[in-house]
Amino acid sequence: MRHNKKFNHLGRTNTHRDAMLSNMACSLIKHKRIFTTTAKAKALRKYVEPLITKSKEDTTHSRRVVFSNLQDKFAVTELFKEIAQKIGDRPGGYTRIIKTGNRLGDNAAMCFIELVDYNENMLKDTAAKKAPKTRRSRKKATASVAEAPTAEAASEEKAAE
């Protein structure tokens, strides 16, 4: 039976895959965005998101656990100091995959994988979208309330005549 065998091996041995994901995670933490194939990005997302969750709690144990996966002092300090503070209130979903099309040589699906809170363009768009948003139902309710007194006043004038 194939229970619990759903895992993309990426055509590599276990040690090669672990080393590749570790290097890609360090690059993602340092540069905040990397360009890679979609399959590698999806594997990297499953690898790096638990590490980012661990970095929210800055203890010696969590630093050692993360360092055992990354093996890069600069990436670990960047993760625990800068990134953990910026995503402290986010409950998950720290990465975003943006598909960019296929590679010319072998037609492999390519994409960007980036940390969500570090894309300035999307942060500006969400801030701009949130400001002018109003609710229609309240405007209709106030408009109907404003019309009601005028109708009552008109009926009172007719009764007075």
UniProtKB/Swiss-Prot annotation:
The keyword Iron-sulfur does not apply. It comes from Parabacteroides distasonis (strain ATCC 8503 / DSM 20701 / CIP 104284 / JCM 5825 / NCTC 11152). NCBIfam families: L17. GO terms for molecular function: structural constituent of ribosome. Part of the 50S ribosomal subunit. Contacts protein L32. One of its GO terms (biological process) is translation. Gene3D superfamilies: Ribosomal protein L17. Residues 130-141 have a biased composition (Basic residues). Coiled coil: none annotated. Belongs to the bacterial ribosomal protein bL17 family. Residues 126-161 are annotated as: Disordered. Residues 142-153 have a biased composition (Low complexity). PANTHER family: LARGE RIBOSOMAL SUBUNIT PROTEIN BL17M, RIBOSOMAL PROTEIN L17. It comes from the Bacteria. This is Large ribosomal subunit protein bL17. Keywords: Ribonucleoprotein, Ribosomal protein. It holds the Pfam family Ribosomal_L17. GO terms for cellular component: cytosolic large ribosomal subunit. The keyword Ribosomal protein applies.
